[in-house]
Amino acid sequence: MSEWLFDLGNSRFKYAPLHGNRAGQVQAWAHGAEAMDAAALAALPSGRIAYVASVAAPALTQRMIACLQERFTQVRIVRTTAECAGIRIAYADPSRFGVDRFLALLGARGDAPVLVAGVGTALTIDVLGADGLHHGGRIAASPTTMREALHARAVQLPASGGDYVELAIDTDDALTSGCDGAAVALIERSLQHAQRSLGVPVRLLVHGGGAPPLLPLLPDATFRAALVLDGLATWATAASSP
């Protein structure tokens, strides 16, 4: 494959070949805040063009770019723009709109009107109208980050473990139920507002490594594991057009 897509998140790294205007088979692994496993870097593919999106720490981003520059003829870095492929971002300063959110909207454009919820280190929510207009969104801590923050302030509260129940009778379940429930409630409230505001039914798309535990609580949601990479494929196609 001569063209590849790379998505470097806050805690996970994904890449896939570019197949037409979609991402091919995705490979992914976790990484540290400032470093990535040397063996993983050595296993990266090579080719003609690497399309790269990153919200990771600058040092890790620069290391990844340098590594890809040794393997690819061109390395193209994605930046959020006010408009792309029929999508118009609501932010007055598009550079402050995260590139992961930008690409997720590009990946979801065929499903609009849609609410896109990304569950990773953060919980991000964005609403996209059928005309391609972004209607804004929200950012909150994801359930995983909520648990880690509670554990950091109160070490007796475990950072993981437990099951979701409506009214828990032990601490582990209470933590899972509270944190997952808070995320689901924010998504549901945002979806209700979007439907009132737009006056039409709004689809719900979720993505991100932290999304699967929330899916049983969001029965109308569609999970798109490769949504950001699909958006990156759309961006790459648009960038290559004359």
From Swiss-Prot:
Under the heading InterPro entries, the entry gives: ATPase_NBD, Type_III_PanK
Q: Which GO terms describe its cellular component?
A: cytoplasm
Q: Where do the catalytic residues lie?
A: 100 (proton acceptor)
Q: Which residues bind ATP?
A: 7-14, 121
Q: Which GO terms describe its molecular function?
A: ATP binding; pantothenate kinase activity
Q: Which reaction does it catalyse?
A: (R)-pantothenate + ATP = (R)-4'-phosphopantothenate + ADP + H(+)
Q: In which pathway does it act?
A: Cofactor biosynthesis; coenzyme A biosynthesis; CoA from (R)-pantothenate: step 1/5
Principal place where this protein is found? cytoplasm
Protein residues bound to substrate: 91, 98-101, 171
E.C. code: 2.7.1.33
* Taxonomic superkingdom: Bacteria
Subunit architecture: Homodimer.
> What name does the UniProt record give this protein?
Type III pantothenate kinase
| The organism of origin for this protein | Xanthomonas axonopodis pv. citri (strain 306)
Per the record, the gene is: coaX
